[in-house]
């Protein structure tokens, strides 16, 4: 039976990088790793409404000796940094982040614009999950997302939805693919993400692969 590798992990150090960048001693590694986990869960859960409204694709965490830097990649950065009370938003966010970390450090926050939502599989998977949770028929939801991706100029994509589709008794997989998605080509820039849609019939699993370009 063939084994599948994670498209992102397979390319770490080639055309992908870690979302967390820091070094730690043996004794402090576990504690810092736990802090990273808490920070990411804070953005997803406690900060969830603004997180989704801004279209946050990822949060990079960089650490220096006395500094913690957060790089927030967002499709709509003005939802975070374009308001009249921008400084107040950042001040509140810094205070909440400091509560999650044991060592008091200078916290820097930077918001980075995501140029195209369609190139980020995280945002595509999340948008599809929202449609399915609103009881949109899964074939229609997939078709709408596929049409957006076709217009965006990506070289290829694959979308898969698994579970009790439209309330069927038997769980099954449905998928659609357009163009090329070369998972074994290391120079291929593949954006991969998963999401869950919580429906009245159960949980639907979503997987999205997007082939943006080749990096030589």
From Swiss-Prot:
Listed Pfam families = Ribosomal_S3_C (PF00189)
Extract the SUPFAM superfamilies matched here.
Prokaryotic type KH domain (KH-domain type II) (SSF54814), Ribosomal protein S3 C-terminal domain (SSF54821)
Annotated Gene Ontology cellular components are: chloroplast; cytosolic small ribosomal subunit
By sequence similarity, the record places it as follows: Belongs to the universal ribosomal protein uS3 family.
Disulfide pairings: none
Cite the record's note on assembly: Part of the 30S ribosomal subunit.
Q: Which InterPro entries match?
A: KH_dom-like_a/b (IPR015946), KH_sf_prok-type (IPR009019), Ribosomal_S3_C_sf (IPR036419), Ribosomal_uS3_bac-typ (IPR005704), Ribosomal_uS3_C (IPR001351)
Q: Which UniProt keywords apply?
A: Chloroplast, Plastid, Ribonucleoprotein, Ribosomal protein, RNA-binding, rRNA-binding
Instruction: List where in the cell it is found.
Output: Plastid, Chloroplast
Q: What is this protein called?
A: Small ribosomal subunit protein uS3c
Q: Residue ranges of the KH type-2 domain?
A: 43-115
- Cross-referenced CDD domains: KH-II_30S_S3 (cd02412)
The terms under GO molecular function for this entry are: rRNA binding; structural constituent of ribosome
Single GO biological process annotation from the record: translation
